[in-house]
Amino acid sequence: MATYLIGDVHGCYDELIALLHKVEFTPGKDTLWLTGDLVARGPGSLDVLRYVKSLGDSVRLVLGNHDLHLLAVFAGISRNKPKDRLTPLLEAPDADELLNWLRRQPLLQIDEEKKLVMAHAGITPQWDLQTAKECARDVEAVLSSDSYPFFLDAMYGDMPNNWSPELRGLGRLRFITNAFTRMRFCFPNGQLDMYSKESPEEAPAPLKPWFAIPGPVAEEYSIAFGHWASLEGKGTPEGIYALDTGCCWGGTLTCLRWEDKQYFVQPSNRHKDLGEAAAS
């Protein structure tokens, strides 16, 4: 009985299935953890959602920013961008079923026995675990309610960017959403910077990756996250696992088997496309 953690799939269905075959993943016996951003950019978002949903209790996932954007498109709030390749999913006969299932998925996964936490972008150093749990529940409750389009319409924006227990209403929900799904860099006090997307070596001072700022969750738990493909899975402290390795950009899809910390990778099929283009 193994636990497999896989980074951002981004619609790369064929690579996901190949990787699961490589590690001999067995639903019902093994458990699959997914860092979110199941959809967009790759060609198989519909197949990814259908497959992941079919796994039932054998999968534990968290929502990413692209998953939330898909929900906003589905609700008629955001524009369907051709580069996201979401039209087959949005026009599928089971789209309502899939997307209503998706919006009821969590922002945070915790395994107390393994001392393991997963969130798409990570855990802000301004939160302890109890605060993270409460904040995740706040957004999850709205997403699973009938008023979820109202929240999705208001979630876009970079402010507020500093946590306070006094935050209320849509500002509170927006900060929580950004912390769980968009965060990369912070100021030394933990305040979010929502503009920089480069690698840590290229970031302007005084910005630091969120995981480079001491926080109470990382003192007691391992943290697995995706979202940040330019890290290429490297440069994190012990106990912090960056799993997005840019499959949809021609990189790889990465899997970590938790029990022995062994990594497995599946090259992106885009390598074939790029190679064929270069040869032609």
UniProtKB/Swiss-Prot annotation:
A Gene Ontology BP annotation from the UniProt entry: response to X-ray
Domain of life: Bacteria
Molecular function, one GO term: bis(5'-nucleosyl)-tetraphosphatase (symmetrical) activity
Keyword annotations from UniProtKB, A to Z: Hydrolase
Catalytic activity: P(1),P(4)-bis(5'-adenosyl) tetraphosphate + H2O = 2 ADP + 2 H(+)
EC number: 3.6.1.41
Gene Ontology CC: cytoplasm
CDD domains, per the entry: MPP_ApaH
InterPro entries in UniProt: ApaH (IPR004617), Calcineurin-like_PHP_ApaH (IPR004843), Metallo-depent_PP-like (IPR029052)
A Pfam family that the UniProt record links to this protein: Metallophos
Activity-regulation annotation: Co(2+) is a strong stimulator (100-fold increase in rate of hydrolysis). Mn(2+), Cd(2+), Ni(2+), Mg(2+) and Ca(2+) are weak stimulators; the two latter act synergistically with Co(2+).
Keyword field contains Hydrolase: yes
Enzyme's top EC category: hydrolase
Subunit structure: Monomer.
Function: Hydrolyzes diadenosine 5',5'''-P1,P4-tetraphosphate to yield ADP.
Family assignment from sequence similarity: Belongs to the Ap4A hydrolase family.
Protein known as: Bis(5'-nucleosyl)-tetraphosphatase [symmetrical]
